[in-house]
Amino acid sequence: MKQVKLLDCTLRDGGYVNDWEFGHDNIVTIFERLISAGVDILEVGFLDDRRSFDRNRTIMPTTQCADQIFGKLDKGNTMIVAMI
């Protein structure tokens, strides 16, 4: 039997509503709650090298910028990804 995986894209797809400006505290809270909920794959935003880094937004130029936001947070067994 195939295993079903749950992917959450709130921090990426939700950005179409607020121009990816969730605020740093909200980004961390959403991330931590989704990890606690046990999602298998968590999309943390868009990578767009035309954008400058802003820790309040989930659209960022590089994976190093994503690591500045999420790198020290507990990821459990969740795979962390971003859309290009």
For the regions a protein language model found, what residue spans apply to each?
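Glycine-rich, proline-tolerant flexible connector loops at the mouths of alpha/beta enzymes
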Residues: 40-68
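Active-site mouth loops of central-metabolism enzymes
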Residues: 9-29, 78-84
